[in-house]
């Protein structure tokens, strides 16, 4: 009976000329200016600390250590958006792009110089760290009553 009802529903929609499944745009634009400014402040602070740290490490580690092969686990990505660029084009799109680039850059561009002998150990340690982090997030969201309520509505 359920299958027959669905078949009739689909047939009726196609007969009338409506698509199945219905095209519904469920994405709603939400702008949280306070959250954006907090993230932007955090990213600027992290950017300054990271650039200072990278400059120090690069000046200290100009040559390979003890003749070992050196592997860099992340490439250093350089983006040249400065505050003067923001003043010339203060649109929201540029601000969002800059925030996105900074977040990606500083969350993925830590430079770790590792001798080739310990490369596998370092990679396994990083994988375990990510798994623990994901597991922790899943446990936190499961224990959050508002998350369970929103999931039960799905």
UniProtKB/Swiss-Prot annotation:
Residues of the signal peptide: none
Presence of keyword Nucleotide-binding: no
Chain segment of the transit peptide: 1-24
Description of the deletion phenotype: Male mice are infertile, their sperms exhibit disorganized mitochondrial structure and the sperm-abundance of mitochondrial proteins and activities of mitochondrial respiratory chain complex IV, and ATP levels are significantly reduced. Epididymal sperm possess seriously disrupted midpieces, leading to a severe reduction in sperm motility and infertility.
UniProt feature coiled coil, ranges: none
Keyword Membrane: yes
Keywords associated with the record: Cell projection, Cilium, Developmental protein, Differentiation, Flagellum, Membrane, Mitochondrion, Mitochondrion outer membrane, Phosphoprotein, Spermatogenesis, Transit peptide
Phosphoserine modification, residue list: 26, 116
Expressing tissues: Expressed specifically in adult testis (at protein level).
GO cellular component, one term: mitochondrial outer membrane
Domain of life: Eukaryota
Localization per Swiss-Prot or TrEMBL: Mitochondrion outer membrane; Mitochondrion; Cell projection, Cilium, Flagellum
TM region positions: none
InterPro entries xrefs: SPATA19
Entry-linked Pfam families: SPATA19
Biological processes, Gene Ontology terms: cell differentiation; sperm mitochondrion organization; spermatogenesis
Job description of the protein: Essential for sperm motility and male fertility. Plays an important role in sperm motility by regulating the organization and function of the mitochondria and is also required for correct sperm midpiece assembly.
UniProt xrefs under PANTHER family: SPERMATOGENESIS-ASSOCIATED PROTEIN 19, MITOCHONDRIAL
Protein name: Spermatogenesis-associated protein 19, mitochondrial
Protein's organism: Mus musculus
């Amino acid at each position: 009976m359920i299958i027959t009802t669905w078949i009739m529903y689909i047939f009726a929609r196609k007969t009338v000329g409506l698509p199945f499944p219905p095209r519904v745009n469920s994405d709603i634009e939400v702008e949280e200016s306070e959250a954006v400014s907090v993230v932007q402040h955090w990213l600027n602070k992290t950017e300054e600390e990271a650039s200072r740290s990278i400059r120090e490490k690069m000046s200290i580690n100009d040559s390979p250590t003890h003749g070992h092969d050196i592997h860099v686990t992340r490439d250093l990505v350089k983006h040249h958006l400065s505050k003067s660029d923001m003043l010339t084009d203060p649109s929201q799109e540029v601000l969002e792009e800059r925030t996105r680039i900074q977040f990606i850059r500083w969350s993925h561009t830590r430079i770790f110089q590792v001798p080739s002998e310990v490369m596998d150990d370092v990679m396994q340690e990083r994988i375990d760290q990510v798994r623990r982090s994901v597991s922790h997030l899943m446990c936190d969201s499961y224990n959050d009553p508002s998350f369970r309520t929103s999931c039960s509505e799905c």
